[in-house]
Amino acid sequence: MAWLTLYLLSVLWAVAGTSTRAQSSCSVPPDQQPWVDGLQALMENSVTDSDFPNPSILIAMNLAGAYNVEAQKLLTYQLMASDSADLTSGQLALTVMALTSSCRDPGSKVSTLLKKMENWSPSSPGAESSAFYGPGLAILALCQKSSEATLPIAVRFAKTLMMEPSPFNVDTGAVATLALTCMYNKIPVGSQENYRDLFGQALKAIVEKISLRIKADGIIGDIYSTGLAMQALSVTPEQPTKKWDCEKTMHTILNEIKQGKFQNPMSIAQILPSLKGKTYLDVPQVTCGPDHEVPPTLTDYPTPVPTSVSNITVIYTINNQLRGVDLLFNVTIEVSVKSGSVLLAVLEEAQRKNSMFKFETTMTSWGLIVSSINNIAENVNHKTYWEFLSGKTPLDEGVAYYIPFNHEHITANFTQY
């Protein structure tokens, strides 16, 4: 009688609680608000008609209250015109939420996303944690548009997550928390099949794992996963055993902003909602008013202190030891660049000095990624890519944003995920 249960539930969805009230939240102190305004302006000003339309940026703009109305309109029109067939489930989900937050009807994009997810299952029993990121976004977007139709998919997703033994990923855990919290909130209390219990159990397991990644300074995972994690921990109905100190996290994030760590528009898009006291669960509640937003004056925007203009030396290694790849190599070069230069400048100088260091880049929503070095290119089918490390630690910023320090050893390692 599963169909009858779904029918009865569908009658009750409309009266189910839809509140997105934060369970644990904190706010930016008034004297620190100019830093957030400057961050938002940087993100909004990155939008041009030649860029890959990034739905995450439009969601952040709408949740925060856009200053640059022209950029907001441009992104909206670009996303409305995007071809759903060319998008992954995660990209399509973000597009649906972006258009919803713009008070635009996503149209057939919702039904296309639902079809993509109806037959969803992990690619393999031991699938990487990141394989759940896109489906998590899809369930979140579908929950906000048609929660009753999403229920069977969300149930399968929750059960799979609880059985999944693969290493935990904070970004994926945060998205899964938002998705299942949406479903949990939509189901009427006392409904059959114990769906709330299932989602509650899954949420408890996920937030416990997220809490284990909270560092002493409040950062959750790393500074770039903290934004989504803050959203998740602020709305989940199942709080972790280890209490989260939101104020400490906010304090550290604001300090990182002052150090210029958030320069990538995508990284800003993920942290901005939390800085504004919003989460992705607020997307359906965005009010679209007249185009009268006025940005703070430019004098309100603090900027990080400029760095020295002296030169630094960076040690740069390219390495490929993967079996099955024709060309194996491990080559190191020292290059000199101006202090404060981004890693991309190091790659360009190395390429100028030695043709073995020739590289190619691809534009993504996160900015430039290095797709090929020394004629060895990433391959989705083989799950290979170029990973950049400082010493033995993977970089958490892209080549167009990471700033090396003097005598730092950067390695580009061809590896698999």
Curated annotation (Swiss-Prot):
Keywords in alphabetical order: Cobalt, Cobalt transport, Disulfide bond, Glycoprotein, Ion transport, Phosphoprotein, Secreted, Signal, Transport
Signal sequence bounds: 1-18
Domain of life: Eukaryota
An example Gene Ontology biological process: cobalamin transport
GO CC term, one of those recorded: endosome
GO molecular function annotation: cargo receptor ligand activity; cobalamin binding; molecular carrier activity
Glycan-modified residues: N311, N330, N413
Disulfide bridge map: C26-C246, C103-C288, C143-C182
Binding-site positions, cob(II)alamin: 171, 222, 270, 365-370, 386-395
Ranges in a coiled coil: none
Record-listed Phosphoserine modification sites: S191
Function: Promotes absorption of the essential vitamin cobalamin (Cbl) in the ileum. After interaction with CUBN, the CBLIF-cobalamin complex is internalized via receptor-mediated endocytosis.
Family: Belongs to the eukaryotic cobalamin transport proteins family.
Quaternary structure and partners: Interacts with CUBN (via CUB domains).
Protein name: Cobalamin binding intrinsic factor
